[in-house]
């Protein structure tokens, strides 16, 4: 049995952790939070990828409408990501506070989000994926590919 075949990732193998996180993000994009959580639960030590794992865990719980449960991982993600990269976590955290009836915390968290000046409150935001998987991801990038 290889390390990759193991159901649970023990120790920090960056390639496997990134693969699991990319799978979790893909499941979230497909609206399958249960599968995303299964991928996240298989990673016992995300190492330096902990902020991403926390963000995805919070988003999966939010998608399951478990807002109170989503608050802790989203809060950790918002703290672990440096500003302005924590905006996605802060937006999700604000929504979870609001859905959980904690309006004051929701407003305070939303106020911490640094939006560009041209974004109005009614603007629909599209959050870009963290991992971008391409069909031909196996090749190396050479100097001429830049």
Task: Give the predicted meaning of each segment.
Residues 13-45:
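Alpha-helical segment of the N-proximal tetratricopeptide repeat
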Residues 18, 52, 86-88, 122:
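Start-of-helix register in tetratricopeptide repeats
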Residues 22, 56, 92, 126-129:
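"A position-specific structural signal for the A-helix of alpha-solenoid helical repeats
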Residues 74-80, 91-121:
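TPR/TPR-like (Sel1-like) alpha-helical repeat modules
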